[in-house]
Amino acid sequence: EREVCLPDSSLDPMFFLHGDGWLQRWQLQDLSVNHIALGLRVQHDCGFDYSALLVYRLSDEGLTAHLTLRHCGTEPMLDGVGFHPFFVKTSQTQIQFFSSGYWPEGEKHLPLSWQRNMPDDIDFSCAKVPNNVWMNHGYSGWNGVAHLVTPHQPTVTIRSSVPYLMLFQMPNEPFICLEPQSHPVDAHNMEGQ
């Protein structure tokens, strides 16, 4: 066991939950009419040493976004990745995904104990319009597919190989985030993670 001092972040001074990739200037790697590839290389004194590649591609089937993270350091490190797209949401947008349980949000936005039984208002195994309330929950046992369906709009389907999904929304806002993640929030402090 070793102690790692996380890098300072003025936007998340207590936890560094969102890392720092989203705060960096990414470099153009490749560009064409139907795709763009952006690369990032980050090294911190504490041992976080990684590269990332983000590729957006348009096709007849839709938009594909692919995010890859590679640890480049000589010592093992607790790296993880989360992809946080914001989607337009109306009062009629329905969300649907399967999961085996969830972590309710606790104090300081950290998760409480994992729960197998979900209240109906946050169980999206059947498509439904989310309540217009603050939601910030992590789901486990996600099968890697989520749908956002809004009448008279293209259906959004999210497909990912990672086992965790965050759902985030603020009341009275026209967006929702469905965030595939490689790990649960605060995983480094969870038993068995």
At which residue positions do the language-model features occur?
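Extended, loop-rich substrate-binding clefts of extracytoplasmic carbohydrate-active enzymes
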Residues: 13-60
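Short coil/turn motifs at secondary-structure junctions
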Residues: 45, 72-74, 86, 90
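A residue-level signal for conserved active-site and pocket-lining positions in enzyme catalytic cores
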Residues: 28, 84, 178
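Acidic-aromatic substrate-binding/catalytic surfaces of carbohydrate-active enzymes
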Residues: 1-13, 176
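Short solvent-exposed strand-capping/beta-turn motif centered on an Asx-Ser/Thr pair
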Residues: 70-75, 151
